[in-house]
Structures are given as C-alpha cells and as structure tokens.
Amino acid sequence: MARLALINREEKRVKLAEKFSAKREALIATINNQNLSEEERFAARLQLQQLPRNASPVRQRRRCAVTGRPRGVFRKFGLGRNKLREIAMKGEIPGVVKASW
C-alpha cells in the first residue's frame, strides 16, 4: 500500500486543478488568441506562471482507489492490476470474465 502522504498529495493536486481550471483555461485562451496585442498575451503568460504548479492537471497521477498504487492502474475501473484481478476473480465486477480462447 502506498504511503498515506503520497495519496493525500495526489488528492490535493486534484482539488487544486479543479479550483484553478476555469482561470487556467481563460488564460490559455488569451495566450493563444492571435488578435490580441503582444503585451496582453505576455501579461496573461505571466499570470499563468503565477498559478500554483500543482494546479496543472499534467502533474496528476492516477492511483488505485484501493491500494494507492501509482502504476498499472486501469482507467476504466480506477483499480490497480492486482486488485482488479482479485475483484474480477471473485465475480464482483459485472461482465468481467477470465479470457479463454
């Protein structure tokens, strides 16, 4: 199981990204708008740089909802490969069966 501090750090990043998402999108739209002057676009870039680093969605990492494991996480289920296998073998995920051909 991942350390609790790492799991909490990821939750903090998710909250920050949600909090600043509208402002971030507006600033990026301003920066990419070719009709505005260079000064306005540069000022928007400076404002974007003033936002917290953890407010960027790029810094987020998917983690297993059960264990907090950062690697091998299936997006569709939000679970790590190990826990997904355990839960699927118990039959707790509808429609998921072991492959055989």
UniProtKB/Swiss-Prot annotation:
HAMAP family with a match to the protein in the record: Ribosomal_uS14_1
Keyword RNA-binding found: yes
Keyword line: Ribonucleoprotein, Ribosomal protein, RNA-binding, rRNA-binding
Single GO MF annotation: structural constituent of ribosome
Lineage of the organism: Bacteria, Pseudomonadati, Pseudomonadota, Betaproteobacteria, Neisseriales
GO cellular component: cytoplasm; small ribosomal subunit
Alphabetical list of PANTHER family matching this protein: 30S RIBOSOMAL PROTEIN S14 (PTHR19836), SMALL RIBOSOMAL SUBUNIT PROTEIN US14M (PTHR19836:SF19)
Family annotation (NCBIfam families): PRK08881.1 (NF006477)
Gene name of the encoded protein: rpsN
Function: Binds 16S rRNA, required for the assembly of 30S particles and may also be responsible for determining the conformation of the 16S rRNA at the A site.
Entry-linked InterPro entries: Ribosomal_uS14, Ribosomal_uS14_bac/plastid
Protein name, per record: Small ribosomal subunit protein uS14
Record Gene3D superfamilies: 1.10.287.1480
